[in-house]
UniProtKB/Swiss-Prot annotation:
UniProt membrane topology term: Peripheral membrane protein
Binding sites annotated in the UniProt record for ATP: 36-43
Protein's UniProt name: Putative ABC transporter ATP-binding protein GSU3001
Transmembrane segments: none
One Gene Ontology biological process: cobalt ion transport
GO molecular function: ATP binding; ATP hydrolysis activity; ATPase-coupled transmembrane transporter activity
Length: 279
């Protein structure tokens, strides 16, 4: 599935303009990020792409068709939104019942429902958790259960609202690993809204910076993270790895304590190591 967003303006009911001049595309099989601070409009943008918000000036095309011209059931068979708080999405008593709700509602036979649930739970590393009660899951497991519910319905596109929010550093990394695996191995197109900058350059194909309802920068992460001053102007910072690379390229080096190397020697060693890693 391919998204083409040309959003001229969206305003809240009180007239406050939330989004304006938003233009970007998401290709089939792409892992795309929308990076912005809290209140920048990320969640609102995802809801527009999912068809939950339909009153706006502009267009959002899904495979060339305006999402507002599609019936909700037609959108939800292919595109799924995962909310930031999994408790807003999970409702059943057990993991199986929650993940099975979508396929059952689509009319699949019970044997097919069971097979879809098993495949989906295995895909999100929750195999064997079908009988668990939802409230016994950890926060990270709940997020995975939400993803499983959409995979069981056969969704080709996942819109993820802050998927790493509320997770510890290891949980954040594992979530990004999961999404990357779904994208690279299963071919799921993913659009991820986030305010976390450090994991972004490691996984995404393309990144857009959203500030005050406008996209101010976009492209591959390695191109986006080349302007520290511009990042600071939108209340964001460079990822630690990008900051290190920037300092190595544009300053005298990065000082390290307790090292037998001079700053210049350390700089050369690190740059050589980075080149070796790339090759």
């Amino acid at each position: 599935m391919r998204f083409s967003v040309d959003l001229k303006a969206y305003a809240y009911p009180d007239g406050t303009v939330a989004l304006s001049d938003i233009r970007f595309q998401v290709a089939r099989g792409e892992f795309c990020g929308i990076l912005g601070s809290n209140g920048s409009g990320k969640t609102t943008l995802l809801k527009i792409m999912d068809g939950l918000i339909r009153e706006y000036d502009g267009s959002v095309l899904l495979d060339g068709r305006d999402v507002r011209s599609l019936q909700p059931k037609d959108i939800y068979r292919t595109v799924g939104l995962v909310f930031q708080n999994p408790d807003d999405q999970l409702f059943a008593h057990t993991v199986f019942e929650d993940v099975a709700f979508g396929p059952r509602n689509m009319g699949f036979a019970e044997a097919e429902v069971k097979a879809r649930v098993e495949r989906a739970l295995e895909a999100v590393d929750l195999a064997g958790a079908a009988a668990k009660q939802i409230h016994h899951l950890s926060y990270g497991q709940k997020k995975r259960a939400c993803i499983a519910g959409l995979l069981a319905m056969g969704h080709e596109v996942l819109l993820m609202d802050e998927p790493t929010a509320g997770l510890d550093p290891m949980g954040e990394y594992r979530m990004m690993e999961l999404l990357t695996r779904l994208n690279r191995q299963e071919g799921v197109t993913i659009v991820m809204a986030t305010h976390s900058v450090d994991l972004v350059p490691l996984f995404l194909h393309r990144l857009y910076i959203l500030s005050r309802g406008r996209i101010v920068r976009g492209g591959p992460p390695e191109e986006v993270f080349t302007a520290p001053a511009e990042m600071e102007s939108v209340k964001l910072r460079l990822p630690h790895i990008a900051e290190l690379i920037h300092r190595l390229k544009h300053e005298d080096g990065v000082p390290f304590r307790r090292t037998p190397l001079t700053i210049g020697e350390a700089r050369r060693e690190i740059m050589e190591l980075m080149e070796t890693t790339r090759s």
